[in-house]
Design a protein with these regions (language model features):
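The N-terminal extracellular segments of secreted preproproteins, especially immediately downstream
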Residues: 10, 18-21, 457
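Residues marking helix boundaries in flexible regions
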Residues: 8, 30-33
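Extracytosolic ligand-binding ectodomains
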Residues: 2-4, 26, 38-460
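Bacterial N-terminal signal peptides
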Residues: 20-31
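N-terminal secretory signal peptides that target proteins for export/translocation
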Residues: 1-16
Length: 460
């Protein structure tokens, strides 16, 4: 009886989910194995196992010894095996962005980190059965050099898997320092295409989509809806201009037409008073001065810092047109309004735990941490070489609430993933769209988003 109690208690420590059932079993078995009670003795309270008192023990009987095998040695009681620690690092760089036009676009302090923590809950739910214990350690830094120092400290303390929420330059510095070491970085912020092309790195996995993927996903939807004539309005930051290049590429790939392109120049201090009006196009000749504005069906906005874009749906010109791009209808990894494939439960869980809505950067942190958890579980261990090989290979199958298994492309380490086409309230579609089959593999339509293997300049 004592041996059974010990085994059952050990199982209960490792599997608290079954605590209710185990408690009932312990009570029942204790009652069955106890001496019969007198009529005047009170029964034990429901749900409590009552140990027999000293008075209940037979007189002049020696205490029971642990069972012994035929050889005479005492049987060792089973013990729970030690848990294997799987620490995950998180480096968050404070980026110097201009204040957006709306305070609602300011990210909370735990953006990204909260998503990774939610993934750790899932990792540890499975880890209690596999013997793995996951933890997340986050460091906030203010410069690339400080980020490298944080990475070094993580590595010295046994962290091999690092989630990076930082700029392109910082990510490259981290990758260079980590070269030749047992470190795998997960990029959840930087969308620069160069990180997947000439500046690709074997030790960097890209969870966040690049600008080509975002532009392609949006373009496919607009073309399917037959909104093929676009007016392109953009800011002047390097990010805005890079998004312009991605939009022009997507238009050429999927059959859209950019009828005009106009630049918005932000005047410091003036955008609170008069902002969002489409700037005039290039200077027209005398013969063109009275020509009508070009016909366009959609205004595409390239304004990654949200300086003027949010005004465009309502102050975009004399003719009302839908707005898409970096504001209005956007391509994104996540929406708080997403409700399919378990997304409702994910959003509810996140909102309950963190008292706010789940943002795309949170989702990206979640996927990064779940990648580690899935790889460790499937490999039945946290050996770095085995886990890294699994993440790089084609056996990884992530299922993060989009109805299709996801993995990383072998040629540039970019996560293959569907992208939501969403407003600030609800998703309206998901790309890739039907009607854009892959050139060589009809069943791999996700590779119609972003850089396909024949286009890749990545050499790792």
């Amino acid at each position: 009886m004592q041996l059974f109690h010990t085994i059952l208690a050990g199982f209960l420590r490792r599997n608290p989910t079954f605590s209710g059932l185990c408690g009932v079993l312990l009570v029942a078995i204790t009652l069955i194995g106890s001496p019969a009670r007198g009529a005047d003795e009170p029964a034990p309270a429901a749900g409590l196992a009552v140990a027999p008192s000293a008075a209940d023990a037979p007189k002049d009987v020696a205490p029971a010894e642990a069972p012994r095998p035929p050889g005479g040695a005492a049987v060792e009681m089973p013990q729970s095996p030690p848990m294997t620690p799987v620490p995950i690092g998180y480096i968050r760089e404070v980026l110097d962005h201009p204040r957006p036009s709306s305070r609602m676009d300011i990210e909370p302090d735990d953006a990204g980190i909260a998503g990774a923590k939610m993934a750790l809950d899932e990792n540890n739910a499975g880890g209690q059965f596999t013997g793995d214990l996951y933890s997340l350690d986050a460091k906030t830094v203010a410069s690339p050099n400080a980020a490298v120092e944080a990475l070094q400290k993580f590595y010295d303390s046994g962290h091999h898997f690092i989630i990076v929420d930082a700029s392109t330059d910082t990510l490259l510095k981290l990758s260079d320092w980590a070269k030749g070491k047992d470190i795998l970085l997960f990029n959840i912020r930087a969308t620069d295409v160069s990180l997947r092309q000439e500046n690709c790195r074997a030790n960097v996995m890209h969870v966040v989509p690049d600008r080509y993927m975002l532009a392609d996903a949006l373009a496919q939807y607009l073309v399917i809806e037959k909104w093929t004539n676009w007016l392109l309005v953009h800011g002047t930051t390097p990010g805005d201009l890079a998004y312009v290049e991605a939009i022009r590429r997507a238009a050429g790939r999927f059959g859209a037409n950019i009828v005009d392109q106009r630049e918005y120049k932000d005047v410091s201090g003036g955008r609170r008073d008069d902002v969002g009006v489409i700037p005039p196009g290039k200077q027209a000749s005398a013969d063109e001065a009275f020509a009508a504005e070009p016909e366009y069906q959609v205004i595409i906005v390239a304004d990654e810092d949200q300086l003027f874009g949010p005004y465009m749906p309502y102050r975009g010109g004399s003719e009302p047109r839908p707005v898409a791009g970096t504001t209005g209808l956007v391509a994104t990894t996540w929406s708080p309004g997403h409700e399919k494939w378990g997304a409702t439960q994910a959003n509810n869980h996140f909102q309950k735990d963190y008292k706010r809505l789940m943002l795309p950067i949170d989702y990206q942190g979640y996927v990064a941490a779940r990648t580690v958890g899935e790889a460790v579980t499937r490999n039945q261990g946290a050996d770095f070489a085995m886990v890294a090989a699994f993440v790089h290979g084609d056996e990884l199958q992530l299922a993060p609430f989009k109805g299709i298994k996801q993995q990383y492309r072998p040629w540039d380490r970019q996560l293959r993933q569907p992208l939501l086409i969403a407003t600030d309230k609800v998703p309206v579609s998901m790309s890739p769209q039907r009607g854009f089959p892959h050139a060589s593999h009809a069943d791999i339509d996700m590779d119609t988003l972003g850089i396909d293997e024949p286009e890749s300049k990545c050499k790792m």
